[in-house]
Amino acid sequence: MAITDWHENDRPREKLLKFGAPHLSDAELLAIFLRVGVKGKSAVELAQDLLDHFGSLERLLNADEAAFCEAKGLGQAKYVQLKAVLEMSRRHFESGLKKGEALTQPEKVARLLQHHIGHQSREIFGLVLLDQQNQFIQFVPLFTGTINQATVHIREVLKTVLDHHAAAVILAHNHPSGDPTPSQSDRDLTHQIQQGLQLIETRCLDHIILGDHGRWYSFTQQGIL
């Protein structure tokens, strides 16, 4: 049955307008993005097939170009459209961080980082740079390693802080394994960077590790920093 034959309250677009986006399922939201289905399948049915194929909405949104474009019903035009939407979302979120509010809550930092390094297949280490009032300046990715290890040079960390005139930093990296629990090497690295930052009188406020499914670990929240 075509979506146009559904009851008005069940059609994704009409449902969103009447009840709001939070009331739609992942498949319904994706169907609005897709706009049309394929032969024999409505946009909602195609959307559900794609979610099943990728395993989750998060994995679909973060799929690389090759994996995304080879899926039935998608393609390069949709890939470009999706990346543009995600980039607009990131810019919108970051614009709200630059309006004078201190960025010290681990939850908000983790949300920021999801836009940058969430669900990457390789480990990425970066810095959230803050000013004297702990207001957001910029996120700077610094090092990319293998799935199991990122090589971090403290000299480059300090140079980045000085180049951006940051007064405080939050360390950040992802665990592609999905488990955000820090390893002993994560703890040792954090301590070494913290000592280096002290030499240039820069505060290290936290180290956030991202896992999967929205999980994250805060060194400050756990009393390590």
From Swiss-Prot:
GO BP: proteolysis
Residues reported to bind Zn(2+): 173, 175, 186
A molecular-function term among this protein's GO annotations: metal ion binding
Keywords of this entry: Hydrolase, Metal-binding, Metalloprotease, Protease, Zinc
The keyword Metal-binding is annotated on this UniProt entry: yes
Stored InterPro entries: MPN, RadC_JAB, RuvA_2-like, UPF0758, UPF0758_CS, UPF0758_N
Gene3D superfamilies reported in the protein's UniProt record: 5' to 3' exonuclease, C-terminal subdomain, Cytidine Deaminase, domain 2
Coiled-coil parts of chain: none
Keyword Protease attached: yes
Domain MPN, residue spans: 102-225
Sequence motif JAMM motif, residues: 173-186
Assigned protein family: Belongs to the UPF0758 family.
Protein name: UPF0758 protein Tcr_1917
Organism: Hydrogenovibrio crunogenus (strain DSM 25203 / XCL-2)
